[in-house]
Amino acid sequence: MWRLKIGDYGTKNDPYIFSTNNFAGRQIWEFDPDAGSVEELAEVEEARLNYLKNRFNVKNSSDLLWQIQILREKKFKQTIPQVKIGDRGEEITPEIATTALRRAVNIFSALQSSHGHWPADNSGPLFFNTPMNEDGGWGLHVEGHSTMFGTVFNYICMRLLGEGPDGGENSGCTRARKWILDRGGATGIPSWGKTWLSILGVYNWSGCNPMPPEFWKLPYFLPISPGKLLCYCRLTYMPMSYFYGKRFVGPITPLVLQLREEIYIQPYDEINWSKLRHLCAKEDLFFPHTTVQNLLWDALHNLVEPVLNRWPLNKLREKSLEAAMTHIHYEDEASRYMTIGCVEKPLNMLSCWAEDPNGDYFKKHLARIGEYFWMGEDGMRVQSFGSQTWDCAFAVQALLACNLTDEIGPILMKAHDFLKTSQVTDNPPGDFESMFRHTSKGGWTFSNKDHGWPVSDCTAEALLCCLYFSMLPPEIVGEKMEPERYYDAVNCIISMQSQTGGVPAWEPRRAPSWLESLNPIEFFDEVIIEHDKVECTASALKAMTLFKKLYPKHKAKDVENFIRNAAKFIEDTQKLDGSWYGGWGICFTYGTWFAISGLVTAKKTYSNCLAIRKATDFLLKIQCEDGGWGESYRSCPNKKYIHLEGNRSNLVQTSWAMMGLIHAGQMERDPTPLHRASKLLINSQLEDGDFPQQELTGAFMGNCMLHYPTYRNIFPMWALAEYRSKFQSSKIF
């Protein structure tokens, strides 16, 4: 059976893998044919069959394979009896709230790894591997409608794995191929798909819009310099431009020739590829290209590319390809060959293979590829790159809010150790600014230290946890960090703030806003330049406020300015209905919780801040009949609040809204909405103390969703903890 291995497993005799912190937080699934008792194997099979039976109702994995493994290893058994609140006027009591909270803490503590973090799936761009929809296609994410991108990718993957093209009407390949052909064939695949199909040899490079590697030779002062782009955009098109510049095509095998016949509605040799460059299936089109943008691509394709591929300018092409590979190798080494994410990892790895199939660069990539695979009861998938630090920081805050520190000291100490071990303690190697990198010293990444890419909100949330730990007895939570490490984190956060007062995710804003209109990616939004995010700003505001209290002398003026400007940014970006748009969660519920929590730390209250009053009204207005909150992922692409179908609730979003209202002082004005929400959380708790997996709650790039299975544990526990604490202190119980 499959087993999750944590840390340096399998690395001792491998010369192609290296780490900055002894592989803390590294997660690798391995298949062991001899592992598992009869009972454990039966439990895994039951979980698999239950998912299969309910996959169109609850599409997201509950991460049961990891839970089964770790709970059996720890011999966990929930010993606290389940509690329920009746519908006939029964009220919540301190005993009921405390019991539900302890049950949640009990199981969640058992799910902690030996390294101190909470291993979990973090499924991002699921067009790599996602369950088939009922119509025979695949979506951009697990809950999304079928797209040409997802369906063509998964059809080709099935064929590469040995499935035949015609296996009967119920065959996955048969249904997928019909879906593709019924919509005009694979010529309608978006630009990223066109690139990958060209590399494979089932599409022609002349049908792709230009991605000239000369881009990497542009001077920095130009607004379209690669150094001014969003890092994800920059690092995706880096290897793509290498492949485009070389017109690289893999081996033309019999299977490749068969695929050419299977996914198009006309003979492959008769397709006019050049006319397909702007074509995109309507199912995939989220960000249409403007006329100006299409004219730009046409000019590059018809005028510039022919010149660059002829003497003497073909010498420039050769130098540009070398420059692209130099950047690729730099980014690979700086991230210990994890790269920045799952979209970039295979592109960089394939670039190294194209350069030298037997070279060390490619072998170093292979040594890290296992960290991108995750096993659940729904099978294996490619995940984003792990959310170890992000989940751990939220978990710590939730556990601390429970006010059970004396009972869970060992859990907190291990989490503290993980966060201390995971801080990035150096800048990127060499002359990192010439490689378009920003300072990283003092930051925290989304996953682990080896990843090497700090994120502003990950840094802020982890710093906040470490500051909390510094206020607790070291014999319970471990020794606090050296002050210089807090200073480094604060310096990192300050360096990210924009002139608006807002804070972007990965790097400071460097480019003008109009550059976003040149977005070539048809299914993503806000991917060309960095954008200030309300969540990043709020996280940073919370951390900086506590830091100022504990270390008032370090960069006092800079910290004060940061706090003032961040609070103003949050107030200035509020929507007319009182909400905030969340970029990393779904969506207005998520953003509004963050915004309120940030403003409150800046001494804003319901009485002195109009933004908090409007936010409170927004949250109360969208509360569901059952006392919860439930927002559809469709809010993200539509940029307006949309309820879940059937006006049903989602427990994670209910928790966000609860905490937002608690921070806004709703307890003191009218606790009834919070009583109703808490009742829903308590009554939804499962027999073992877990909470049920429901809809997706994470998001990115406006149109793609993320799956965070630990959210269902962390946020209901956190909300119940704050609810219980506030009611006890206000003597409403």
UniProtKB/Swiss-Prot annotation:
PFTB repeats lie at residues 121-162, 426-468, 486-528, 563-603, 612-653, 674-715. One of its GO terms (cellular component) is lipid droplet. It is an enzyme of class 5 (isomerase). Its EC number is 5.4.99.41. It catalyses: (S)-2,3-epoxysqualene = lupeol. GO terms for molecular function: beta-amyrin synthase activity. Keywords: Isomerase, Repeat. The active site is at 457 (proton donor). InterPro entries: SQ_cyclase_C, SQ_cyclase_N, Squalene_cyclase, Terpene_synthase_CS, Terpenoid_cyclase/PrenylTrfase. GO terms for biological process: triterpenoid biosynthetic process. Pathway: Secondary metabolite biosynthesis; terpenoid biosynthesis. It comes from the Eukaryota. Gene3D superfamilies: 1.50.10.20. Belongs to the terpene cyclase/mutase family. Oxidosqualene cyclase catalyzing the conversion of 2,3-oxidosqualene (2,3-epoxysqualene) to lupeol, a pentacyclic triterpenoid with anti-inflammatory properties. PANTHER family: BETA-AMYRIN SYNTHASE-RELATED, TERPENE CYCLASE/MUTASE FAMILY MEMBER. This is Lupeol synthase OSC3. It comes from Citrus sinensis (Sweet orange).
